[in-house]
């Protein structure tokens, strides 16, 4: 690390200097792209470095609660209680693993129809430097995208509803 610190060459991102080829360089600037990234499932596109879709499904969740109770004769027994509630979750909850006795009528779909996903511009640059895929993976500053006035009204056989700056399918 110390060796690298002494060998680093500060450069201006807007100027390419071939005398720095093969050297450890340092620059800063704004990452930009001319690409349009698209979420094909929802027909949403934006000129952005990345477009992140966050999806959640309303589904049953099981909560297991155990407590010890004294029994006549001086022993103890474990009493298990199961509670069920509906929650919004980005991850699929497998209701097949629920306690069968207490979960009657509480089953979740086999999968989330549209999972969370991330769409990335093909070419991202800072000045004259194109960022590597390993650097692009580290970009994690997101802001809400203002949805276009027109959004799909149906996806498959389901109606799409606008909810604030999001979509609800149901």
Question: Can you say where each PLM-predicted feature lies in the sequence?
Answer:
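Alpha-helical transmembrane signal-anchor/signal-peptide segments
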Residues: 1-17
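N-terminal start-of-chain detector that recognizes signal peptides
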Residues: 2, 26-28
């Amino acid at each position: 690390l110390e060796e690298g610190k002494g060998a680093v060459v500060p450069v201006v991102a807007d100027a390419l200097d071939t005398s720095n080829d093969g050297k450890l360089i340092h620059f800063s600037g704004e990452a930009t792209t001319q690409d349009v990234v698209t979420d094909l499932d929802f027909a949403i596109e934006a000129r952005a470095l990345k477009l992140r879709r966050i999806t959640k499904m309303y589904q049953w969740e099981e909560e297991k609660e155990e407590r010890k109770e004294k029994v006549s004769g001086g022993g103890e027994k474990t009493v298990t209680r199961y509670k069920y509630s509906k929650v919004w979750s980005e991850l699929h909850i497998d209701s097949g693993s629920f306690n069968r006795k207490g979960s009657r009528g509480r089953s979740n779909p086999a999968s989330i129809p549209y999972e969370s996903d991330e769409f990335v511009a093909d070419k991202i640059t800072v000045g004259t430097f194109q960022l590597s895929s390993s650097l692009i993976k580290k970009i994690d500053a997101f802001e809400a995208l203002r949805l276009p006035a027109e959004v799909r009204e149906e996806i498959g056989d389901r109606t799409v509803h606008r909810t604030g700056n999001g979509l609800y399918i149901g």
